A protein has these predicted regions:
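Hard-cation-handling environments
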Residues: 1-28
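Conserved, mostly hydrophobic/aromatic
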Residues: 33, 103
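Short, glycine-/Ser/Thr-/acidic-enriched flexible segments
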Residues: 36-40, 74-76, 111-115, 136-138
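Generic long, charged, amphipathic alpha-helical segments
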Residues: 64-81
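Short, Lys/Arg- and Gly-enriched loop/turn segments at beta-strand edges
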Residues: 114-121, 141-142
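Short, compositionally biased
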Residues: 118-136
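Single conserved hydrophobic/aromatic residue that forms the stacking wall/gate
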Residues: 160-169
Length: 169
């Protein structure tokens, strides 16, 4: 679009007009992610903690889009719009254009058990998958892979047992 072209030109200017300074933030795409911000990253919304976040695929390609991350809870109020950058806080995450035929994975790092405890059970999402990785001089080692909860497990925790016949009114 014309607005994106103007923004690209303005970003290259040494002294861009003030009116163009917030344009990148306004033009960022919204990438909807399969998680609940309130459950998985409660400190992100509660105290504005910024976690390292990045795409974990297509790393040999330069990102061509900018996005904020939205959750898919009932109200989609969960939004991550502040990201760690090389100089200061960025208001969007560099991402790749989505391809219809493949999922796009983004990872949040340095979350820890504290977020799990605070998050509890929100919007029936259950625990997400987690990977524990250690790094040393020789590279990295995947220490543990923890599967998230299935829909059946989450419903069971809510005392809804899918193995029992359902009564319809």
């Amino acid at each position: 679009s014309i607005t994106r072209e103007i923004n690209q030109i303005a970003e290259g200017l040494k002294h861009a007009p003030d009116e163009f300074r917030g344009l990148s933030k306004l033009l960022a795409d919204k990438y909807f992610c399969n998680f609940s911000l309130f459950q998985s990253l409660p400190d992100s919304w509660a105290i504005d903690q910024i976690f390292p976040i990045m795409p974990i695929q297509r790393l040999d390609e330069k990102p061509d889009r900018s996005a904020t991350l939205q959750d898919i809870t009932c109200d989609s109020d969960g939004k991550i719009a502040n990201f760690i950058s090389t100089r200061n806080v960025a208001h969007y995450l560099p991402v790749h254009s989505l391809k219809k035929t493949e999922p796009y994975y983004v990872a949040v790092f340095l979350v820890g058990a504290y977020q799990e405890i605070l998050g509890d059970m929100h919007n029936l999402f259950g625990d997400t998958n987690a990977v524990h990785v250690s790094v040393n001089e020789k590279g990295y080692n995947i220490e543990q892979i923890i599967d998230g909860e299935t829909v059946a497990e989450v419903l069971d925790l809510s005392l809804i047992h899918i193995s029992e016949p359902t009564r319809r009114s």
